[in-house]
Structures are given as structure tokens and as C-alpha cells.
Amino acid sequence: MTIAKGGKNVYGAAVGILMLESRFPRIPGDVGNATTWPFPVMFKVVPSASPERVVLQGPDGLQSAFIEAAQELVRTGVDGITTNCGFLALFQDDLASACGVPVASSSLMQVPWVQAILAPGKRVGVLTVSAATLTPAHLTA
């Protein structure tokens, strides 16, 4: 016999995805296309967090909006959170502290691990929309 516990508004979507405000096509395979995932996900678009603002100008001033959106996803029922923008690595610690669920804010979090397993003299390659604004802080957050 299975006993069901309550406490969530929504069940069955364990992963929440914080999304930048954008209008470009999200084809299958893109994090922002629900058909990419072999399981249900829940999306939350963060108001005023455009790619231009986050990537080119920097995310300063958007931290509270991302925390609020992440907390809303948790209240709704997700058990973990990720984002659709690697530049959000800068918010990793703040999001993880504020949410109470696992948070993976950026695929850039994997760079130190990948570098550690490479042979000496080899380097990790990173594809980015803006090399000019990708800083060492993004890679060590």
C-alpha cells in the first residue's frame, strides 16, 4: 500500500527551469523546449531578465527576481532547479541558499571538474554567446 503525502500544489514536475525573457525559437533539444526532457518540467520566466541584460550588461539588480522566481517554483512543487543561461553561474550560491532544493544554475559549474579529469596540458573548451563578458568569476562560481 502506498501512502500519498500532501504539501505541494503540483506533482510530477520535479525539475524547475528559470528562463530568461526571450522570443527566439526553442527547438527540441533546447532547455526551453518542454519536449527536450524525457520527464515533465516546470518553467518560470524571470521578468526583466533578457539575454541582453544578463549576458551583455551583467545580472546586477536581478538577483532578487531570480530568487523569488526560484522560490515560487519550489512552493509550486519542484524538487530541483536549473536555468537556461550559463551566465547565471554568478547566482549559484544565492539561489542554492534561498531555495532549500538542489540548484544547478549553469553548465559552467562543470568546467573545474572536467579540467581536473583532463590530461595535463589539455584545456576545457567553452562555447559562449559572449566571450567578451564571460569572466573567470563565471567559471569559479
Locate predicted features.
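N-terminal active-site wall of soluble small-molecule enzyme domains
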Residues: 64, 68-69, 87-94, 98
